[in-house]
């Protein structure tokens, strides 16, 4: 990973020293898949710099599985920091589960298409080519989280293929779509590129056409019942510091500030 500049290192030290003075804390984080690749690289750096320990619980940003973050919080599970797709985090803020003033946008990710490693790659360079790729595929997989909801409830209908592909398209719960594609259980699969990139055994064809693309923002906030709020704030500050930028970009995401420009 690229070494942060002197200015970035200085900012990182300033961000991290303040909470460290209060003593090491154990921070409980609930996180969905989209930001996980960058998060996994960054958390050890944060722990070394502060002495804090981060415990991670994973779940989808939405959906019916018990592991989904909204369902965990609804049944009273504790958390300090919540990291998930932005509009789902907004829903938790409306429900009083996340502190509204604590929300910070971390990064943006685009939906991409993947095939099993070595398989032919369909042409998705235009809307019509993308449409034909969907019709030609023998099986299609999409996630049960934000990107999959967009595909199944809006995009497939908008381009006029829903009725023709609904019997061969499958919503995947509880594991990355890429793993299903890697096992050969789906010919093509869709998920944010940051969730596809860590999966072995697949080839990422590329993002879906810009005209059809939805860019998911991933955001962080403090849970309303956070027991380690100060340490949680320090973690969030680190995740949006210049020191975090290389890991975010390497995961296939766009740094939130850059994406807004």
Go through each PLM region and give its residues.
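Exported/periplasmic ABC-transporter solute-binding proteins
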Residues: 24-67, 71-78, 87-95, 99-100, ...
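Absolute N-terminal positional cue centered near the fourth residue
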Residues: 3-4, 19-21
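Bacterial N-terminal signal peptides that target proteins for export
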Residues: 1-11
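Bacterial N-terminal signal peptides
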Residues: 9-19
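Phosphate-/polyanion-interacting regions in eukaryotic proteins
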Residues: 83
